[in-house]
Amino acid sequence: MGKIIGIDLGTTNSCVAVMEAGEPKVITNSEGNRTTPSVVALTEGGDRLVGQTAKRQAITNPENTVFGVKRLIGRKFDSPQIQGDKKVLPYKIEASANGDTRINLRGKQHSPAEISSFILANIKKTAEDYLGEEVTEAVITVPAYFNDSQRQATKDAGKIAGLTVKRIINEPTAASLAYGLDKKGEEKIVVFDLGGGTFDVSVLEIGDGVFEVKSTNGDTHLGGEDFDLRIIDYIADEFKKSQGIDIRGDKMALQRLKEAAEKAKMELSSAVETDINLPFITADASGPKHLDVKLTRAKLESLVADLLDNLVAPCKTALKDAGLTSSDINEVVLVGGMTRMPAVQERVEKIFSKKPHKGVNPDEVVAMGAAIQAGVLQGDVHDVLLLDVTPLSLGIETLGGVMTKLIDKNTTIPTKKSQVFSTAADSQPAVSIHVLQGEREMAAGNKTLGQFELTDLPPAPRGVPQIEVTFDIDANGIVHVAAKDKATGKEQSIRITAASGLSEEEIKKMVNDAELHADEDKKKHELVDAKNTAESLIHQTEKTLKEHGDKVDAATKTAIEAACEELKKVKEGTDAAIIKEKSEALTQASHKLAEAMYQQAAQESGQTEGAAQDPKGAAQDDDVVDADFEEVKDHKK
């Protein structure tokens, strides 16, 4: 049985870990890094790049380099979050036929789940290279405040990447596993997780291997990307003041600004001031323009003051929902790269009236927790019980457009709950079940997860039929809904997938495309290897001919030169088999030259040995030799 890996699929960076000798171990990628940028690019030549290689070329290929896709996953195109992102992202965001979000790369639409699958496939390969075996199963983390469609889309991404997702686990919960695995006493902790694109806060009780989530809250569209945007706007405004040019319309310049903003933000976690220098950022009639802006930590904090304020309410709500106060909390664990920012740490200390715990690596702790959960599922980790909760209330729309809740937020999962409803009109032949997720009283203010109908109801006065609606949330936080007419036993059910926008057929096609792409990658690799071998062979043959061509007859030399020319003609082509065939032909033709060289070397070696033996051969008088020898011996005596 292969290993189940733990994956933190992050907005900015992703990380993978596995259980080894009872401990979670983070796996380094091919470049020796412990995290991989969550960036995907499509080059002009049609090559797909993932990770650091994609990030490196972002400045020259901004429209076809996707970052922060986690903020788009499972969302409709007309949602305010997508409409806001559309204005600031350099790549094209479009609507699909059913209103879902799509990313256009070089004329082809991709779903956010598909883009995420490219990142997961890259991580899968990293794990396989390390483990030396195929990896087919994973535990993947998501923000605790992800709704059903976002969870389902993440699961779809895993499937497209060739992974069976054994469990979707909340990021703060995963972090608590890594933090508290060895803790013996009971503790009440808060996991404060501010990452690249999302914010979560969870309150947990941990002790003796039991990890019970009491409440969770957050914002799935608040993170480091938002802080970066504030810095980008500030730099662009300062440049416009000094040069009179707004560089935000230049996508290449904007990408340079993004990188500079990210770097400045990181530097200001340890320094109080930084210089942002971008030479040749743009040009006008007077010549090239250079950007040079100073940014202080105090200025940065003023730029993001409202974002820092937005961290407070979810924390207060989470404490209230858990029935606790800040004085009840033993530790506040910081997770996510953004928690390195001093202003964030100060705000956390102010909210919870205690200094936060910094003993875990905020970039790796979530992946390590996912690996521990993978170990639990695999049977390698014992005495660990994880009790997570659903982050949002679930219900259906009832008469008057009201949302009637069946499962309240922060209910421990898995869970199942039923409630009986009836018809609103006489002889109503069908009922429409509108499944909702959210906290608003009216249906219109909540997220639609899906709709289905229970039909062929027998004619009856209003209020008489008994329709039992059952909500079932599995351990992944994914919802299943069923409706049953108690009189006839007729039942209709739905596994909520509509909002993720990917049907089983679409997922199957993407899986096939991913497998095809893997084959294409293999073929490209073979072609590159064949070309490199051919190049090396041509160079070596021409060098050898130049130095030793006179050692073979004219016919052999001509045959070698002809084979060399044949290989030169095909080596720039795209058929690896033909290049290999012509390389083999040149190798065979060159054998005669090699034989001639060795024969000549052997002859020369033989002549040298013969010349060394001649003096001995000439002096065949044994007595003379003995006498000389004896004389020396006598003299010595």
Curated annotation (Swiss-Prot):
Q: Is Calcium a UniProt keyword of this protein?
A: no
What InterPro entries does this protein map onto? Answer: ATPase_NBD, Chaperone_DnaK, Heat_shock_70_CS, HSP70_C_sf, HSP70_peptide-bd_sf, Hsp_70_fam
> What PROSITE patterns does this protein map onto?
HSP70_1, HSP70_2, HSP70_3
Disulfide bond annotation, renumbered to this chain: none
Name one molecular function that GO assigns to this entry: ATP binding
**Which parts of the sequence carry Phosphothreonine?**
T198
Region of interest (Disordered), ranges:
597-637
Ranges annotated as biased composition (Acidic residues): 620-629
Instruction: Describe what upregulates or represses it.
Output: By stress conditions e.g. heat shock.
Q: Which UniProt keywords apply?
A: ATP-binding, Chaperone, Nucleotide-binding, Phosphoprotein, Stress response
> Which interval of the chain is the signal sequence?
none
Asked whether the UniProt record includes Chaperone among its keywords, one would answer yes
The record's section on Pfam families has:
HSP70
Bias-annotated ranges (Polar residues): 600-610
Q: Which HAMAP family match?
A: DnaK
Please name the PANTHER family in this protein's record: HEAT SHOCK PROTEIN 70KDA
Q: Main role?
A: Acts as a chaperone.
Task: Say which family it is in.
Answer: Belongs to the heat shock protein 70 family.
User: What is this protein identified as?
Assistant: Chaperone protein DnaK
Organism equals Desulforapulum autotrophicum (strain ATCC 43914 / DSM 3382 / VKM B-1955 / HRM2) (Desulfobacterium autotrophicum)
Point out the gene that encodes the protein: dnaK
